[in-house]
């Protein structure tokens, strides 16, 4: 690969509806004008402050799937499946931007990579408006004041996250990572990582749709859920892309075997990008509600959460932050 090119990818321009086209206009003059070929690029991804990096990068690091993601030298690194080739990205928070180092297999994928990274880190959120709404609740106000600007860790691949959400049902973070790593080793697409220990792209639904269920070290009911999900994703019966109607996607997910409210809402929050998704039955949310004197039964907490709309996914980040868990701490 050639020398690193430094680009400032403006947050406001990239947040508009034609984000990819705007990004192309910004970056093409800085790259060689060849139609294809690999490239190494360094970008600054600005955001509207404040941004609390602890839960954002802590969550990504604590749940990293070996071979696909890692925390290395102060950066979250992962592989990316892009239109023309695979890529590796390293992301590190700074005071007013996120450093983004891309190793692209094909330079034509630069705009797509920028868009995915901004989506993953929720960089186009408006923390001022969100925090103002949440801080109006006396129980949440101290949490917002302590660490303003919490973002929702999202995903670069909605299908990947949906599969991982199923693998994470009713198991520890470590167990979920182990199950996902086995899928990656068996079915992922190998990729070269010039700077670290990443080895694969996460397998796409088509690669998983034909797998032998006996190879999954999961309870039989969970195997059925995984296979039903990947079949629906591979066939297009379920579309988790950015243009998907949220309630339609929720309804299709609910129709799958093994999909309860927690799984549907976690996918809505992380994969579909619904800012109002609310997994009210999540154990961490329930424990936080109890500690704050909020109602803790699902129905009562759902009623209380109406005051946080349309930003309940962000309220969840503040509630989760009350717990002592690695997802709340950015690694050194």
Predicted regions mapped to residue ranges:
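HhH-family (HhH-GPD) DNA N-glycosylase catalytic core used in base-excision repair
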Residues: 1-332
């Amino acid at each position: 690969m050639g020398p690193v090119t430094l680009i400032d990818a403006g947050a406001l321009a990239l947040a508009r509806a034609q984000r990819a086209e705007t990004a192309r206009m910004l970056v093409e003059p800085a790259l060689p004008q060849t139609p294809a070929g690999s490239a190494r690029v360094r970008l600054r991804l600005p955001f509207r402050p404040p941004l609390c990096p602890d839960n954002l990068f802590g969550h990504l690091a604590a749940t990293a799937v070996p071979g696909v993601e890692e925390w290395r030298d102060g950066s979250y690194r992962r592989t990316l499946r892009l239109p023309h080739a695979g890529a590796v990205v390293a992301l590190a928070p700074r005071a007013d931007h996120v450093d983004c180092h891309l190793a692209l297999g094909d330079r034509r994928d630069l705009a797509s990579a920028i868009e995915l990274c901004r989506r993953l880190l929720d960089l186009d959120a408006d923390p001022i408006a969100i925090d103002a709404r949440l801080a109006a609740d006396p129980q949440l106000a101290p949490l917002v004041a302590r660490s303003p600007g919490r973002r929702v860790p999202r995903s670069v691949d909605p299908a990947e996250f949906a599969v991982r959400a199923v693998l994470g049902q009713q198991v520890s973070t470590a167990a979920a990572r182990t199950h996902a790593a086995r899928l990656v080793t068996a079915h992922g697409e190998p990729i070269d990582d010039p700077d670290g220990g990443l080895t694969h792209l996460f397998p796409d639904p088509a690669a998983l749709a034909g797998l032998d269920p006996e190879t999954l070290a999961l309870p039989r009911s969970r195997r059925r859920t995984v296979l039903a999900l990947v079949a629906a994703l591979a066939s297009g019966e379920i579309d988790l892309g950015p243009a998907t109607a949220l309630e339609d996607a929720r309804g299709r997910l609910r129709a799958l075997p093994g999909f309860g409210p927690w799984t549907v809402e976690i996918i809505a929050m992380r994969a579909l990008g619904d800012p109002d998704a609310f997994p009210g039955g999540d154990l961490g949310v329930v424990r936080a509600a109890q500690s704050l004197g909020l109602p803790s039964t699902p129905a009562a907490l759902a009623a209380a959460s109406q005051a946080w709309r349309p930003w309940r996914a962000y309220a969840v980040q503040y509630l989760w932050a009350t717990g002592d868990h690695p997802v709340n701490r950015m690694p050194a």
